[in-house]
Every structure is written in structure tokens, then in C-alpha cells.
Amino acid sequence: MQSITVALDAMGGDFGPRVTVPAAVQALSHFPELKVILIGDQSLITSQLSQLGTSTSSRLTILHSEKVISNSEKPSLALRNSQNSSMRMAIDLVSDQEADACVSGGNTGALMALSRFILKLLPGIERPALVSALPTISGKRTWMLDLGANVSCDADSLFQFAVMGSALAEEHLCRPPRVAVLNIGAEEIKGNDLVKRCAEMLSQTDAINFVGYIEGNQILHDVADVIVCDGFVGNVCLKASEGTAQLFIEKLKTSMMASTIKGWIARKLFSRLFNELKTLNPDQYNGASLLGLRGIVIKSHGSADVSAIVNALGEAVHEVKRQVPSRISDRLEAVLLERHY
């Protein structure tokens, strides 16, 4: 079995080594081919390992870093001041081919800027995009992009997002994914010039299985496998859907934990529903891919817990196995060749 090495920014996210270190240890038991390099304050990481009753090994190593890029730091400043930071060092390991992928829960803007600067974009890609899987009512997944890397886009960028998202989804689905553009209506006359132009380009591309427009209330209804939008719209939709899921889960949990007769009834009636709703928990879908780069970079939620970071590491393993950047490059080359002729 070929090993897969992932560089984990141990200082990234709201909780740092308190969750990243236990997550790395758990991930090693989940993925036998995985090796993890923990990048961060060595004393803090070692302390967490001691509390877990474990230590470094051939599969778990530490690379000490002096600095952490804060969540409030502007991307331009992060680029200038990133030397010896845990995030920069994680990306450098991918660039130097000492790691196959990196995972960070740190500053999204800084991660995108550093990844683009260090790893460079694939040929034909103008901007990277954040993509993540979302649950649907059928139990399947849908992939949505962009989720915040680009707050404004032109039609060419949206088209490239569709190509990249289609390539990623196909590696999970093993079939041509259905691609839709998020819009305010399903009719062709609806929407602004941006989405209309993107839809026109997609409808003329045989290599993309374009199924038309999709409205916001259909995102989780399994009518498309890939949903394309700009980063502003995508981020708002993502946060709204996560908040709604958490609301239902917390409300139901509160009712079921009540010690009154109402709580007993709720436990009897809704225990199965509660288990179903737990599949909507955003932590189960943690690990947004930064697509369009010459290397694999996975963005974890800043507030991610241990299980969520394990999922992000799992996404990194999957993308390395499936060689996602080269798949995207091949797909883009085929699409551009088709459009040229």
C-alpha cells in the first residue's frame, strides 16, 4: 500500500492543537495509508500527544513553526509575513513534494493567497475556487462552488468552476455529474447577465452534463450534483444551510433531553428522526477543497471539532488517491479543445 503524507496546520482554526492533534491521531487509525506531519508549536503539540498517551512515530511527525497567521490578518500582509508560519510551512511541504496535500483551518483569505502564490494555478484556470459537499434529502451529496474564495466573478470564471467541480464530483460519483447554475429562477429569462452567459457557455459544451438553472430551495434536493455560483452567493447559502441544520438539531435535542413527559414522548417519537437529522451536521462534510491549484489544499472549518478535522484529512486522502489536480487539468484541456473547435 502506497503511503499518503498530509501536512496538517496544527495551529489553524479556533482551537489549534487541542483538536488538530487528537484528530491526527484518530485519522491514522481510520486511514492505514496515511502519514501526518503536524506543523506548529512543538511544545504545545507534544503536550497534547502526552495527554493522549501517545508520541511521534514513523506515521506522525512534528515540524516546529515559530508563527501563526491570525484570522484577522489581511491576505496581503500574510503573504509578506508568512515565513516560518504553520500555514506557510504546510503549503511549502506540498510544493517541495514532501507532502501530498495540506489541511488548514486557518485564515481562508491567507490560505488562498499563499496557495496561489506557492503552488500556482493549473493552466487555463484564472482563479481557484472553494468547493465542498453538501447533504441532500436522498442521502447523496452535491458539490457547491465557489464558497467564498471569490466574492465576484465573471462568466469565464464560473465556467471554469463548473469544469473543476464536475471533475471533482466525477471522482466521487464515478459517473458524469449533473451540473447546474444557481439562479433566482429556473426559467431561461431569469437571472443577471453573469449567470445567463455562464449557462450559455455550459449548454454549448458537450463535455459538461449541464442541466440548467437551480433555485436556492432546490440545493439540498438532489436535482444536481454540482452547483455553480460566485463566492459571495455560495458563502451566504452555505452559512444559511448550516445554521438551519444546527437549529433543527439543537431544537430536537433540547426536546428529547427534557425530563418531563413531553421529553419522554419526544424521545419515543423522534429518536429516529434525530439520527437522520444528524446526517445534516456540517462537521460530517468538513473539508472544502481549494480547486484549480497544482497541489491539493483542503480548508477546514475554523470551528471544526476533532471528528470534523478527521473528515477533512479523509478528503485529502481521497483527492490524493484520485489525483484530482491532474483530473481537473485533463478535463479542462478537453473542454478548451472542444470550445476551440
From Swiss-Prot:
Pfam families xref list: FA_synthesis
Subcellular location: Cytoplasm
Keyword DNA repair among record annotations: no
Keywords: Cytoplasm, Lipid biosynthesis, Lipid metabolism, Phospholipid biosynthesis, Phospholipid metabolism, Transferase
A single GO molecular function term of this UniProt record: phosphate:acyl-[acyl carrier protein] acyltransferase activity
Main localisation: cytoplasm
GO CC terms: cytoplasm
Gene Ontology annotations of biological process type: fatty acid biosynthetic process; phospholipid biosynthetic process
Pathway per the UniProt entry: Lipid metabolism; phospholipid metabolism
Entry superkingdom: Bacteria
Family matches, as InterPro entries: FA_synthesis (IPR003664), Phospholipid_synth_PlsX-like (IPR012281)
Catalysis performed (reactions): a fatty acyl-[ACP] + phosphate = an acyl phosphate + holo-[ACP]
EC number(s) given by UniProt: 2.3.1.274
Matching NCBIfam families: plsX (TIGR00182)
Function of the molecule: Catalyzes the reversible formation of acyl-phosphate (acyl-PO(4)) from acyl-[acyl-carrier-protein] (acyl-ACP). This enzyme utilizes acyl-ACP as fatty acyl donor, but not acyl-CoA.
PANTHER family reported for this sequence: FATTY ACID/PHOSPHOLIPID SYNTHESIS PROTEIN PLSX, PHOSPHATE ACYLTRANSFERASE
Assembly behavior: Homodimer. Probably interacts with PlsY.
UniProt record similarity statement: Belongs to the PlsX family.
Record's protein name: Phosphate acyltransferase
Organism of provenance: Vibrio parahaemolyticus serotype O3:K6 (strain RIMD 2210633)
Gene: plsX
